[in-house]
Amino acid sequence: RLYKTGKPFNMTFETADTHTPGYASPKIKNKFNNQYANAIYYSQNETYKFIEWIKQQPFYENTTIVIIGDHLSMCSDFFKNKNGNRTQYNLILNPSPDLKYSKDCLKNRTWSNYDMYPTVLAAMGVKIEGNRLGLGTDLFSNEPTVFEEFGYDYVNKELAKKSEFYNKRILSPNGEKIAMHNTDDNQKYA
């Protein structure tokens, strides 16, 4: 229905079925003797079938598909090679034909999930002045990410700082107390 309106739209869905202990549909036939393995297989298979279905639709030509793995599996003992270099899986399929980028900017980047916001918008054809939104950098640009520019240690230290203004004016504009966790125990509530 959204396609038929002729207006741009976004559809987002999350597959949480691969969170521990694995939540495969009771309707599927188990392929493995392990619930978690079945959940991973089922999730990947359903995602594949959904993408193949989209490719057959009239709106595919104008559709950017983004698959983001927001973290590694929390069931680390499931994987046999514990020393392997496991990484998140991220895919941008069918980006806008207007997207211009150098292949060099896609390799060996130091980036974070913050960068996915402007990167996804750019993949959809949105022009971003300065190639940055919030803390994120469009990874299709040659602009350095905040982690490339300042390093992990510095950025993480800055992000860990507390902001009295933010806590009192944004999180608690009506003065209600907010539970806080602070490593130096100087402040328990905003």
Where are these regions (language model features)?
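Solvent-exposed soluble domains appended to multi-pass membrane proteins
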Residues: 1-190
